[in-house]
């Protein structure tokens, strides 16, 4: 993607790296111990949702972020995406950074971060997981039904459905019902940022894999033996992934610490950035 056509998702311009013959948009700011930010998975997902922690953490850390393949400023090939692709991509990012890195990851992206951390334990120092899935939610691997839905969504009907789900009005409804506890926090700038990333060429290929269930993954066995310190951050008002799901992570791994941020939904880090940083900043700075 040409530099001048890149979406302004973060306060720095993307740098592109080649991965499996595709261009991955990466972002970096600050100095210090490395932190890698990993966004969630949905039709409007991109590094845009990580702009608050990116700016705030870069005052103390060398902060890295990326747009996962199929999202943001990264390439959007017409692939049949699977969870393993994203775990491989995060692993490649860790290899590229090349030193112990803290992961801050959201939702299904957090599940992929856990699997990458288990694959490269020497390159992941700790994890902060925001409303993670993969235990008790989005943890059933794809079967016949998922592939049937995928084929339907790859049809002209699926394209029409995607267009309907990614109008500004539809995105506002999604953000108000799932992403933000207070609809007043959905500013015009925020809405436009989410809308624009849905309207890039090829934007529909990865989200239909998510909607089909092809991106699900069960992380319970891996999470149970994860050696790194792990903090789980949950929005008190999250509906799609409600706070009650946090108990699944604690039962699976007793050493897991859970903190709740009030007046926040799934995008905790964007809706309540100060409260988020008050919990995550000291955790990342710990020896």
Regions found by a protein language model. Give the residues of each.
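Conserved HGGG/HGGXW glycine-rich cap/lid loop of the alpha/beta-hydrolase fold
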Residues: 22-73
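Conserved loop-alpha-helix segment in the C-terminal half of the alpha/beta-hydrolase fold
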Residues: 225-264
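Active-site loop/oxyanion-hole signature of alpha/beta-hydrolase fold enzymes
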Residues: 51, 61-104, 269, 278
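An N-terminal hydrophobic leader/cap segment in hydrolases
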Residues: 1-15
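Conserved catalytic-core motifs of eukaryotic protein kinase domains, centered on the activation segment
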Residues: 47-49, 74-79, 139-140, 243-244
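Conserved hydrolase catalytic core segment
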Residues: 99-141
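Catalytic active-site module of serine/aspartate enzymes centered on a nucleophile-bearing elbow/loop
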Residues: 254-287
């Amino acid at each position: 993607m040409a530099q001048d056509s890149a979406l302004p998702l973060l306060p720095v311009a993307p740098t592109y790296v080649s991965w499996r013959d595709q261009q991955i948009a990466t972002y970096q700011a600050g100095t210090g111990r490395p932190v890698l930010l990993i966004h969630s998975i949905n039709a409007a997902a991109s590094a845009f949702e990580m702009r608050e922690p990116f700016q705030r953490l870069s005052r103390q850390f060398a902060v890295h972020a990326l747009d996962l393949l199929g999202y943001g400023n990264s390439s959007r090939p017409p692939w049949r995406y699977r969870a393993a692709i994203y775990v491989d991509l995060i692993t490649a990012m860790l290899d590229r950074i090349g030193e112990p890195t803290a992961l801050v990851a959201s939702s299904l992206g957090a599940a992929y971060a856990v699997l990458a951390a288990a694959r490269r334990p020497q390159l992941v120092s700790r994890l902060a997981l925001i409303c993670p899935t993969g235990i008790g939610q989005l943890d059933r691997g794809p079967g016949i039904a998922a592939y049937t839905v995928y084929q339907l969504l790859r049809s002209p009907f699926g394209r029409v459905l995607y267009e309907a789900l990614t109008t500004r009005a539809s995105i506002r409804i999604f953000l108000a019902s799932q992403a933000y506890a207070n609809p007043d926090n959905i500013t015009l700038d925020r809405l436009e940022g989410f809308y624009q990333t849905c309207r890039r060429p090829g934007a529909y290929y990865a989200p239909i894999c998510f909607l089909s269930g092809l991106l699900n993954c069960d992380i319970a066995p891996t999470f149970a033996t994860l050696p790194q310190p792990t903090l789980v951050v949950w929005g008190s008002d999250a509906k799609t992934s409600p706070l009650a799901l946090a108990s699944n992570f604690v039962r699976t791994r007793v050493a897991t610490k859970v903190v709740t941020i009030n007046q926040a939904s799934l995008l905790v880090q964007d809706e309540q950035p100060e409260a988020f940083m008050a919990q995550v900043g000291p955790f990342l700075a710990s020896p």
